[in-house]
């Protein structure tokens, strides 16, 4: 196991929050995955539910999202890649401060929704990464 310098943040990423990718026809993709792989979801895609270690008493299960986006989406910008990974994190505000100090490119401002806070960074190969601090319960 590689132990990277963590600047007093014990855990940076706690799990995979989601896989997002561009599709020519997102609706058709969701229908195909529902029909052939049993991934029945909603308008956004499918959510895998699971229990987070150490948080077995959480009111709601944790989730990992699978979601096709329209191929013309600008959500993944400034990345030119047809996909984006979402990672679950703890203490997003502090983590983004540390990442900025480390020279990591921060994209946009933190956004907050009923299901958590979101921030974005770029990796060295131009992949946009979404960081998600879920609200209690993991959803």
Predicted regions and their residues:
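Active-site beta-strand termini and strand-to-loop segments that position acidic
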Residues: 50-53, 121-124, 134
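A short acidic/small-residue loop/turn micro-motif
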Residues: 44, 114, 135-138
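N-terminal beta-strand motif that seeds the catalytic metal site of vicinal oxygen chelate
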Residues: 2-30, 82-85, 135-139
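Vicinal oxygen chelate
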Residues: 23-28, 78-128
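Conserved beta-strand in the GNAT
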Residues: 67, 130
